[in-house]
Amino acid sequence: MGDPTLRTDLGRVLVTGGSGFVGANLVTTLLERGHEVRSFDRVPSPLPAHPKLTTVVGDITNGEDVATAVAGIDTIFHTAAIIDLMGGATVTEEYRQRSFSVNVEGTKNLVHAGQQAGVQRFVYTASNSVVMGGQDIVNGDETLPYTTRFNDLYTETKVVAEKFVLGQNGEQGMLTCSIRPSGIWGRGDQTMFRKVFENVLAGHVKVLVGSKNIKLDNSYVHNLIHGFILAAEHLVPGGTAPGQAYFINDGEPLNMFEFARPVVVACGRKLPNIRVSGRLVHKAMMGWQWLHFKYGIREPLVEPLAVERLYLNNYFSIAKARRDLGYEPLFTTEQAMAECLPYYTDLFDTMVAQGAQPAVAAAPKS
């Protein structure tokens, strides 16, 4: 175990996926703290011009683009990824390769380029799902083994990539660690609550899945960013973070529907109170997913992984992050909800006006 008092300045920072939800919020926070930041993404940055912000538009699977992005950088935060929440044996090879090319090969490109460019610190964005294999997890910690049961490509690619990143710790002088968020929410979220809103507007939410006593945890985006930065600051020789993975969340396990209910009510809608067996719904969605890939019918209403999170406890301890990094959530769930509720009601109203077009299933997670 390293010394938690050892910390370092981040120097010049690269944020991959800097145009996305997490990435743009991270870039903004780093700029507010006075850092020199470079944003790397496939699309231009939505952020206003800033004297300490430069942007690189490019593809993480392109070696030349990646080399340009990492040149002169001291710390890399890797948030870019594709979210494919379906998987299993029936997925097409094209579907599988799309995820692996970005989430695994793209990560390897970035690590190797960073090593060659003299980057000192590399913080990877994984997921709490890397240890979720269809079992109840209550206050799970980082000693849990990686899952070997993959029902979605996102988890599968995150397991492979995290193992690689942590295995590269210390190679050519670059220290690495990994952050495992839970469901990420807050201003800019186009995934968690957008999916809830799509189903509410489509009239699909007739019942609730699983018991009210089942809990999961979430990661408010500014709590997550706080954890990212602390981890990077502790990537120092003899420090606590090198080669380590950390669960970073809000520290307040909640039932998903009870978490979402205030938002849905604020949007002028209601959630039902009738609940049904999650295991039955999960089996139905697994069958539907198989038919989707086998015969091309429409995607399931809810991905099997999402159903598991509704009927199985899945929440994780932040004790290791507290001990090693000094992490404490900056915002309670109540405080965070008050801050971002106007954003979510505006998003809902926009979706109503636009006819609630579905989010792209494999949108980059940034």
Swiss-Prot record:
GO terms for biological process: steroid biosynthetic process. Its EC number is 1.1.1.51. Keywords: Lipid metabolism, NAD, NADP, Oxidoreductase. The degradation of testosterone by gut microbes containing 3beta-HSD leads to a decrease in serum and brain testosterone levels, causing depression-like behavior in male rats. The prevalence of M.neoaurum and 3beta-HSD is higher in gut microbiota of patients with depression than in those without depression, suggesting a potential causal role for gut microbes in certain types of depression. It catalyses: testosterone + NAD(+) = androst-4-ene-3,17-dione + NADH + H(+); testosterone + NADP(+) = androst-4-ene-3,17-dione + NADPH + H(+). Belongs to the 3-beta-HSD family. The active site is at residue 154. It is an enzyme of class 1 (oxidoreductase). Catalyzes the degradation of testosterone into androstenedione. This is 3-beta-hydroxysteroid dehydrogenase.
